[in-house]
Amino acid sequence: PGPNGCPRRRGRQTYTRFQTLELEKEFHYNHYLTRRRRIEIAHALCLTERQIKIWFQNRRMKLKKELRAVKEIN
């Protein structure tokens, strides 16, 4: 817990270039992961399942924003 009794927030995760490349590669093939695949990727990249899950959630939101921006241009 922090100084005022509130739980401390985790620091921002930074991914290596290799991890990012592998995650992007996986996202290119599949925007959603099965639990089994998430476990495999987590082990391969030395990350937690939770980090993989959140990375994919964030990446889907990024894609959604990008698609919305392209739609507005056209």
Curated annotation (Swiss-Prot):
Pfam families: Homeodomain. GO terms for cellular component: nucleus. Keywords: Developmental protein, DNA-binding, Homeobox, Nucleus. GO terms for molecular function: DNA-binding transcription factor activity, RNA polymerase II-specific; RNA polymerase II cis-regulatory region sequence-specific DNA binding. InterPro entries: Antp_homeobox, HD, HD_metazoa, Homeobox_CS, Homeodomain-like_sf. It is found in: Nucleus. Residues 8-67 bind DNA. One of its GO terms (biological process) is negative regulation of transcription by RNA polymerase II. SMART domains: HOX. Belongs to the Antp homeobox family. Sequence-specific transcription factor which is part of a developmental regulatory system that provides cells with specific positional identities on the anterior-posterior axis. This is Homeobox protein abdominal-A homolog. It comes from Apis mellifera (Honeybee).
